[in-house]
Amino acid sequence: MKESIIIKNFGPLKEVEIDDIKPLTVFIGKSAGGKSIIMKVIVLMRYIYKMVNIRSYLKNAKITRSPFKLRFNSLLHDGLKGMITAQTEIYYTVEINGNKYTLKYTNRGLQSDINIPDKDLIFFKEAYVSGMRSLIPIWASKAVSVKGENLGFFFHETFNDFNDATDVIKEQKLEYLNLKMKVRKSGNRPKLFTIESLQNDAVPIELRYASSGIQTSAPLVAIVHYFAQEFSFKDAFQRSR
């Protein structure tokens, strides 16, 4: 599978073309230059492409009535809607088995009416890790008292991914620090996250009281571990149908 994307006139992005989105792609540039916007647009288009694959799967199975509709504007969150203009263009292309499939957003409209044969169908999980992830420890410790509060779509998506991860992962090693994060749950109380040493009997501390670096990195490591080793594509596919 090969991905490419062209983005024109989207917020601070005047024209961006990435011919091959690699598994590890690093963006380097000045602050507020639009790096996070690029990633949000890629995640958005990947999500739409995933849903097009599901729709194609159902259509190929002779289920002609789609259980969902793709409305581009309803998928724009955290200020992205205000970055769209009449001049905005997005072209997202996936090449698989020598065949190319392109989603387009032009003239304020999404063009996603493509059908993908069974041999080219793919299903994946896209995840955007919010830059506000350092707030996860304090948010998790006050999960009940802050119910209904809103820190933005992408933060809550990241927090939900972390919450799902720590439903499964009860001990996450942070070997680069000789530490581990332990997860405990008791009744209806919020989960308790503690940081403990891998080598000695140092007194454990709650994640929310750990250093800023640990507060930022521990949730990220847990999320990556979850999607790499514990995530169930079968369950996710059934939820998406």
What are these regions (language model features)?
Residues 1-43:
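Pre-Walker A-like glycine/lysine-rich segment at the N-terminus of P-loop NTPase domains
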Residues 6, 46-240:
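Phosphate-coordinating catalytic segments in nucleotide- and nucleic-acid-processing enzymes
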Residues 22-26, 130, 241:
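Short, proline-centered helix/strand-breaking motifs
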